[in-house]
Amino acid sequence: MIHTNLKRKFSCFVLVFLLFAIICVWKKGSDYEALTLQAKVFQMPKSQEKVAVGPAPQAVFSNSKQDPKEGVQILSYPRVTAKVKPQPSLQVWDKDSTYSKLNPRLLKIWRNYLNMNKYKVSYKGPGPGVKFSVEALRCHLRDHVNVSMIEATDFPFNTTEWEGYLPKENFRTKAGPWHKCAVVSSAGSLKNSQLGREIDNHDAVLRFNGAPTDNFQQDVGTKTTIRLVNSQLVTTEKRFLKDSLYTEGILILWDPSVYHADIPQWYQKPDYNFFETYKSYRRLHPSQPFYILKPQMPWELWDIIQEISPDLIQPNPPSSGMLGIIIMMTLCDQVDIYEFLPSKRKTDVCYYHQKFFDSACTMGAYHPLLFEKNMVKHLNEGTDEDIYLFGKATLSGFRNNRC
């Protein structure tokens, strides 16, 4: 019996102790909630935290004072200095690149071309390694590179043999002037770029050789205003005469001459004898604008590339890509160039529409491509971020130059 009473007393004691503990915990929780609520009242809102680390009206950071209109006290907070995380440098084209960047195979090719000198180059101008500011180089290009087309008054195109074949309308009345233009390379790094819509938003778009838009619209767009083709394609591509790819926009054909040859000299010895194919095309498509670039222009451009380059460059004409860039700088206020300077998608795949691998497509073998890219990087007025993410370089055209 005594044992049972002790058991009951002990149970009551435990219950009282638990009840007391619960009351204490509840009271402490209430006090904590009150303190938390009070802290929330004076906590800085996130929107004001953002203001505190950037520019803000001066009143926010001055001592507390009364708003004379509202009679409400304005709380002030101390300025918070944001710690800026250092940005890693973006790996983009170095405008001071030299042949030391080439692999042994491309170095050997470069030396072979120097020895061959197929086009009898004998450069006697200034340089190498002449330095120009961006604006001075633009002026130099504008004044010394004449972008013009063969006309029916040029001998021997003024003979009966050529009567009716060349376009009657002057190139400059047919093309431009435009405000914002795009030059779209054929580089493999354009694949999966998703740049199509951006490219098509330009006033005019220049493409090269047989680079298609069908099946690649998302990456390269659909618009073609000018297509620059080389004489090798015109003479060897069987589909050239009938493929609809070559009936959209304005066609410009170029063929390299011997160094600084005039039109009659070049006509006697073209690099590729495209003349009969050109006539056949004009008979099939008489309304299609199809111009022939004067052969002096590529060598005028080559002279300037050699002048500013620290090394001897290949004695071969500039690439179609570089010629197209200069053509559009003549016609447009602003030229956006896509994947001439490689982006983060850089690849040894030469073309976005073919599976052909060769590092020469980026670094150059036949053409002085490495130094062409140096020139474009020097002229670039866009950001390294644009180059890295989109492969986009932005150049000003010649029309707005203050020379």
From Swiss-Prot:
MF-aspect GO terms: beta-galactoside alpha-2,6-sialyltransferase activity; protein homodimerization activity; sialyltransferase activity
Membrane-spanning parts: 10-26
Subcellular location: Golgi apparatus, Golgi stack membrane; Secreted
UniProt topological domain (Cytoplasmic) ranges: 1-9
InterPro entries xrefs: Glyco_trans_29, GT29-like_sf, Sialyl_trans
Keyword Nucleotidyltransferase: no
Keywords: Disulfide bond, Glycoprotein, Glycosyltransferase, Golgi apparatus, Membrane, Phosphoprotein, Secreted, Signal-anchor, Transferase, Transmembrane, Transmembrane helix
Principal location class: Golgi
Pathway(s): Protein modification; protein glycosylation
UniProt modification remark: N-glycosylated.
Tagged with keyword Methyltransferase: no
Disulphide connectivity of cysteines: 139-403, 181-332, 350-361
Job of this protein: Transfers sialic acid from CMP-sialic acid to galactose-containing acceptor substrates.
Homology family: Belongs to the glycosyltransferase 29 family.
Subunit structure: Monomer and homodimer.
Protein name per the record: Beta-galactoside alpha-2,6-sialyltransferase 1
